[in-house]
């Protein structure tokens, strides 16, 4: 980008596409790409293509036929700095956010007749007059001591022998002590999702949430 670009509202993707299956899904993601190629997802949108005209009356696709579909992403307010790039990614799955189609589908997207519509916020001369928000008002933070640090991870494991993919998400809030009441608190969530390639009936998901409390002898 040669200059900053600000968007406010829902980005929209209009795709001219065809499918080799009667049921298919399309997922679109808008990302901010830094000069070092690190990416940050900004917003996304999903559409079951049998819902392209109505969520009430489903219409299977005719394989090979071209359709024009509109995917609206989630509303967002974002500034893309000059020097960064804006990336649009398109896929037929976005698991585990959305359950896959019953049969793997291949979509053909015709780029010349497809487009991305960004809700660009025009520059307003009065922008410089807008004062920043004051510091938020709220209760004072807990008087606590960190005993064990937090840990977050997102790991994808592929077993080529079993043709199996596994996703493990860990959100460990660590262990801390609330000093005013001498209470130790620990919280950890582990999510596991697994499926065998091309066998969507094998999809499984499990979430374990552990919370522990300790004070004195208990």
Model-derived regions: residue spans:
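Glycine/threonine-rich phosphate-binding loop and adjacent beta-strand/alpha-helix elements that clamp
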Residues: 1-218
């Amino acid at each position: 980008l040669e200059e900053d670009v600000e968007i406010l509202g829902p980005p929209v993707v209009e795709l001219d596409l065809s499918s080799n299956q009667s049921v298919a899904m399309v997922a679109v993601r808008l990302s901010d790409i830094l000069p070092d190629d690190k990416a940050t997802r900004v917003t996304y949108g999903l559409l079951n293509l049998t819902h392209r005209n109505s969520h009430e009356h489903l219409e299977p696709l005719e394989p090979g036929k071209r359709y024009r579909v509109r995917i609206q992403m989630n509303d967002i307010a974002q500034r893309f700095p000059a020097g960064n790039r804006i990336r649009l990614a398109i896929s037929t799955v976005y698991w585990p956010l959305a359950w896959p189609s019953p049969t793997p589908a291949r979509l053909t997207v015709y780029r010349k007749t497809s487009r991305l519509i960004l809700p660009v916020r025009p520059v307003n001369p009065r922008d410089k007059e807008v004062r920043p928000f004051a510091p938020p008002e709220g209760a004072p933070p807990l008087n606590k001591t960190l005993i064990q640090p937090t840990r977050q991870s997102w790991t994808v494991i592929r077993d080529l022998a079993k043709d199996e993919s596994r996703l493990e998400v860990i959100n460990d809030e660590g262990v801390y002590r609330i000093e005013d009441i001498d209470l130790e608190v620990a919280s950890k969530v582990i999510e596991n999702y697994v499926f065998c390639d091309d066998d969507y009936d094998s999809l499984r998901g499990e979430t374990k949430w552990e919370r522990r409390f300790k004070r004195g002898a208990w």
